[in-house]
C-alpha cells in the first residue's frame, strides 16, 4: 500500500511497496545504504525474504530460496551440495556480493564467486536482496547486486524440527533464543543435514568414463550469539558460527592417478560489535574474523595426501558505519578495512600472500517535494592495484499520487582475487573489472496490484579471463547486458499472488555471442492460500533457453539448452498451536532438465517435515 511516512520514522520518503515476500511497505532494511530505513524508501529494486517465507516454501537450501527471486538465475552441477553459481541480471557469478550479517562472505579459491550450496539454510533467518550496482556502498563485487543473509532471530523461543525425503534426505535442527534478565539474550542453534544424493552426471552428455555412484552431501552446523543492551541507546553483541560439510561429486578416471571426488569444507566466523542508536545519530563498529579450509581429495588416500588440493583463506574485517538524520532524509559515512590471507601451499597459491583494502564511503538520501534523491560515493585503496573510486545516483519522481518514475546510474567493480593474482596461473598485473549501469523504472499501485517495471543496461569492461596459450589470467573481455524486469503482487479473495518476468540479453561485447549459462527469459509465480487450516503453496518457474559448453569434446563445443517449466506443491497443517507438519513435492511433473550441461537435476522429490515450538 502506498502512503506518506514521516521523516523521523521513515526518512520522509513516499512509501512504495516493491516486489517482496514481506509486502509491508514499512518493513525495515539495512542493506541498501548500510543504515536502517523502510524498504519503500529504497529506489533500487529490493526484495525481503523472512524465515516465515522459507518455512512456507519448505526450502532445504539457500539456492532454493534465491531461485524464486526476480533477476536471479541459479546453475548447479547436480543436487544438494554440488557446485553452484548465482547470476543476477546476466552478470557473472563473481559479480554478486554475498554478505552474512553485513560482513563479506569469505571466499576461498580462484573463482571469486559465492557457492551458496555450502551455506546452511538453518542459519538463514532473513534475506535482503538488492539488484543493481552497489560498489559505491560496499566496494568490490557488487556489480549485479547484493545478497545479505541475516542470521539474527527476531523472537525468543525454542524450536525443534526434523525432516525426511527422497534420496535418503534427513535433517534435524534445534534452536533457541532466551532472555537472561531484562537486557541480555542468548541464541543457540545446532543443525544436521544429510542426503545420499544421486548420480549427477548425465552420461549421454559427458562420455562413458564418468564415475557411477551416488553424490551425497553432509552438513553439520553450530551457531551462538550473545546480545546485551547497556542502555536504551548503547548495545553490543558477540556471535560465532561454523559448519563442517562433505560433498561427494563425480570425477573422471585416469589410470594410475588418485580419483579426487570428495570435497571437505570447514568454515568458521566470529563477529563482535558495538552499536549506538540515538534519536538522530546511529553508529556501529563491527570486527570480524573468518577462516575457511576447502579440501578436494581421494578418500582412499585422505585429504592430507600430496594428491589432495587445499584452498585456505583467512579474512579479517573492521567496519565503522554512521548515519545522521538531516532535513528530510539522512547522510551516512563510514570506513571499511579488510585483510585476506592465504596459507602457503594451497591448491592455487604456492606461497602465502595477503591483500589489504581500506574503503571510505558517503551515502545520502533526501526528499524534496515529490522528488526523492539518493547517492553514494566510495574510494577504495587496495594493496595490489591502488586506489579505485565508484559512485552512483538515483532520483525518484512521484508524478501522480501512487505512481513513481525512477532513474539511476552507477559504477561498480570487481577486484581480482588472490588466486587470480598469485596462483599457479596468476597474473599480478591484473586490473579490476569495471561496470557502468543505467536503469529506468515505473512503479505504482493500480486496482490493488503493486507493480514495477524496469529496463536496464550494464556495460562491463576489463573482464578477467584465462588464456590457454599463455596459461595466465588477463584483462580483455567486455560484456553488454540489456534487460527488462517486471514484478507484481496482489490478492484475489483468499489467494495471494506474486509474479515476476525477466528478459536478459547478456552478450560478449566483442564477439556478440550470448554469455553462457544465463536463461534469456524467466517467469516466476507464487500462489499461496489457506483452506480449512491447511496452508497451500504452488510455485511455478519457467527457465528459458540458455547456452553452455560441452567440455567432453575438443575443441569445446557450444550447446543450446532448451527451456523448462517447473512446478512445486507445498502444504502445511498446524496440528496444535505448537506442532506443525509440512509436506512438499518439488518438480511435480518430474521434468528432465539441466542448468549446467552434462549434470542432471534430481527429478521429482518428496519431503515431509515437522516442527515443535515452545
UniProtKB/Swiss-Prot annotation:
Membrane topology field: Multi-pass membrane protein
Tagged with keyword Calcium: yes
GO biological process assignments: monoatomic ion transport
Chain location of the short sequence motif TonB box per the record: 26-33
Positions that bind cyanocob(III)alamin: 83, 85, 92, 110-111, 251, 309, 517, 551
Residues that bind Ca(2+) 1: 199, 211, 213, 215, 250
GO cellular component: cell outer membrane; pore complex
Pfam family membership, one: TonB_dep_Rec_b-barrel
Source organism, top-level taxon: Bacteria
Function: Involved in the active translocation of vitamin B12 (cyanocobalamin) across the outer membrane to the periplasmic space. It derives its energy for transport by interacting with the trans-periplasmic membrane protein TonB.
Family: Belongs to the TonB-dependent receptor family. BtuB (TC 1.B.14.3.1) subfamily.
Name by which UniProt lists this protein: Vitamin B12 transporter BtuB
Protein species of origin: Escherichia coli O9:H4 (strain HS)
Amino acid at each position: 500500500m502506498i502512503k506518506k511516512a514521516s521523516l523521523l520514522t521513515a526518512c520522509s520518503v513516499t512509501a512504495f511497496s516493491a516486489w517482496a515476500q514481506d509486502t509491508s511497505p514499512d518493513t525495515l532494511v539495512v542493506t541498501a545504504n548500510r543504515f536502517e530505513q523502510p524498504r519503500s524508501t529504497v529506489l533500487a529494486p529490493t526484495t525481503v525474504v523472512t524465515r516465515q517465507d522459507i518455512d512456507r516454501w519448505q526450502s532445504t537450501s539457500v539456492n532454493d530460496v534465491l531461485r524464486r527471486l526476480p533477476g536471479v538465475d541459479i546453475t548447479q552441477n547436480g543436487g544438494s551440495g554440488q557446485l553452484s553459481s548465482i547470476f543476477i541480471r546476466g552478470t557473472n557469478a563473481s559479480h554478486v556480493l554475498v554478505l552474512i550479517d553485513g560482513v563479506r562472505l569469505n571466499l576461498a579459491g580462484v573463482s571469486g564467486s559465492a557457492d551458496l550450496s555450502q551455506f546452511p539454510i538453518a542459519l538463514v533467518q532473513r534475506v535482503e536482496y538488492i539488484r543493481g550496482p552497489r560498489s559505491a556502498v560496499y566496494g568490490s563485487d557488487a556489480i549485479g547486486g547484493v545478497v545479505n543473509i541475516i542470521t539474527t532471530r527476531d523472537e525468543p523461543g525454542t524450536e525443534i524440527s526434523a525432516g525426511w525425503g527422497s534420496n535418503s534426505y534427513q535433517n534435524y535442527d534445534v534452536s533457541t533464543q532466551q532472555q537472561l534478565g531484562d537486557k541480555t539474550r542468548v541464541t543457540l542453534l545446532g543443525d544436521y543435514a544429510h542426503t545420499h544424493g544421486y548420480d549427477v552426471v548425465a552420461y549421454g552428455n559427458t562420455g562413458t568414463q564418468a564415475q557411477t555412484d551416488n553424490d551425497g552431501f553432509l552438513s553439520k552446523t553450530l551457531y551462538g550469539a550473545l546480545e546485551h543492551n547497556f542502555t536504551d541507546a548503547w548495545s553490543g553483541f558477540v556471535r560465532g558460527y561454523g559448519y563442517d560439510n562433505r560433498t561427494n561429486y563425480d570425477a573422471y578416471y585416469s589410470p594410475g592417478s588418485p580419483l579426487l571426488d570428495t570435497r571437505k569444507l570447514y568454515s568458521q566466523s566470529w563477529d563482535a560489535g558495538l552499536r549506538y542508536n540515538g534519536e538522530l545519530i546511529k553508529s556501529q563498529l563491527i570486527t570480524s574474523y573468518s577462516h575457511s579450509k576447502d579440501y578436494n581429495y581421494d578418500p582412499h588416500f585422505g585429504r592430507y595426501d600430496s594428491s589432495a588440493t587445499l584452498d585456505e583463506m583467512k579474512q579479517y574485517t573492521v567496519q565503522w558505519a554512521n548515519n545522521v538524520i538531516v532535513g528530510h532524509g539522512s547522510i551516512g559515512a563510514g570506513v571499511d578495512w579488510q585483510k585476506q590471507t592465504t596459507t602457503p601451499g594451497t591448491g592455487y597459491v604456492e606461497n602465502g600472500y595477503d591483500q589489504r583494502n581500506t574503503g571510505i564511503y558517503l551515502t545520502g538520501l533526501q526528499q524534496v517535494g515529490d522528488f526523492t534523491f539518493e547517492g553514494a560515493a566510495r574510494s577504495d585503496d587496495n594493496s595490489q592495484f591502488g586506489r579505485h573510486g565508484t559512485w552512483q545516483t538515483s532520483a525518484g519522481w512521484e508524478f501522480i499520487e501512487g505512481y513513481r518514475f525512477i532513474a539511476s546510474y552507477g559504477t561498480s567493480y570487481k577486484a581480482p582475487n588472490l588466486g587470480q593474482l598469485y596462483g599457479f596461473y596468476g597474473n599480478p598485473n591484473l586490473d579490476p573489472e569495471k561496470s557502468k549501469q543505467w536503469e529506468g523504472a515505473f512503479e505504482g499501485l493500480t486496482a490493488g496490484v503493486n507493480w514495477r517495471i524496469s529496463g536496464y543496461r550494464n556495460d562491463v569492461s576489463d573482464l578477467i579471463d584465462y588464456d590457454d596459450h599463455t596459461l595466465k589470467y588477463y584483462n580483455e573481455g567486455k560484456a553488454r547486458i540489456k534487460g527488462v524486469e517486471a514484478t507484481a503482487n496482489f490478492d484475489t479473495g483468499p489467494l495471494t499472488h506474486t509474479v515476476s518476468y525477466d528478459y536478459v540479453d547478456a552478450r560478449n561485447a566483442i564477439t556478440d555471442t550470448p554469455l553462457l549459462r544465463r536463461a534469456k527469459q524467466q517467469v516466476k509465480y507464487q500462489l499461496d492460500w489457506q483452506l480449512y487450516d491447511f496452508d497451500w503453496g504452488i510455485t511455478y518457474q519457467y527457465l528459458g533457453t540458455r547456452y553452455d559448453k560441452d567440455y567432453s569434446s575438443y575443441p569445446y563445443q557450444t550447446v543450446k539448452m532448451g527451456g523448462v517449466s517447473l512446478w512445486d506443491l507445498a502444504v502445511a497443517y498446524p496440528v496444535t498451536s505448537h506442532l506443525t507438519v509440512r509436506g512438499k513435492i518439488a518438480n511435480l511433473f518430474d521434468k528432465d532438465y539441466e542448468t549446467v550441461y552434462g549434470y542432471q537435476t534430481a527429478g521429482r522429490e518428496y519431503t515431509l517435515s515437522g516442527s515443535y515450538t515452545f
